[in-house]
């Protein structure tokens, strides 16, 4: 029965690997404006493909979901750690950015269903990054100006202006 059917293959991190087409079929992420047009939270089924972390940079392990804890095991990274790795400007413990502003666990773009509005879910250049949901109007600082979540995180980082 050995005809290329790899049943229990894993990569170097212990994640299961399918024997065919790993990482394919994910090129159309960032479905802009697709979401809960009638309000409510739209939570699509999670595709746990983890093929090098959706951005698929060759040779980059910065987008894996676990890291070595120094004791031979692995620990899951929090959403804040993943976001910090993607931001430019170093990986020091500068400030706690707050991550996704209380929307933990939501994947994909929720959107508002407006015409032509691109549902600024904060995924600027990070296609399909989990946890970056919303319309960009969460806590607009009282000015009425809509900001993306990435803009808010960048504001909190020193030296980004």
From Swiss-Prot:
Expression induction per the record is: By abscisic acid (ABA) and water stress.
Q: Where is the composition biased (Low complexity)?
A: 93-107, 115-130
Write out the biased-composition intervals (Gly residues).
20-38, 131-142
Stretches the record annotates as Disordered = 1-161
Which residue spans traverse the membrane?
none
A Pfam short name: Dehydrin
Tell me the ranges holding the sequence repeats: 101-123, 124-144
Alphabetical list of PANTHER family matching this protein: DEHYDRIN (PTHR33346:SF52), DEHYDRIN XERO 2-RELATED (PTHR33346)
Q: Please state what the protein is called.
A: Dehydrin DHN3
Species assigned in the record: Hordeum vulgare (Barley)
Taxonomy, top ranks, is: Eukaryota, Viridiplantae, Streptophyta, Embryophyta, Tracheophyta
């Amino acid at each position: 029965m050995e005809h290329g059917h790899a049943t229990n293959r894993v990569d170097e991190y212990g994640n299961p690997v399918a024997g065919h087409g790993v990482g394919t079929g994910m090129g159309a992420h960032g479905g802009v404006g697709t979401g809960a047009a009638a309000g409510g939270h739209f939570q699509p089924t999670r595709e746990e493909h983890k093929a090098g972390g959706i951005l698929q940079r060759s040779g980059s392990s910065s987008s894996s979901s676990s890291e070595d804890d120094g004791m031979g095991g692995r620990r899951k990274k929090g959403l804040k750690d993943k976001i910090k790795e993607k931001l430019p400007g170093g990986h020091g413990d500068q400030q706690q950015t707050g991550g996704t502003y209380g929307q933990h666990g939501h994947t994909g773009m929720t959107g508002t269903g407006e015409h032509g509005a691109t549902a600024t879910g904060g995924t600027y250049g990070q296609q399909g990054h989990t946890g970056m949901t919303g319309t960009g109007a969460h806590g607009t600082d009282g000015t009425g100006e809509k900001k993306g979540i990435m803009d808010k995180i960048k504001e909190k980082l020193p030296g980004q202006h």
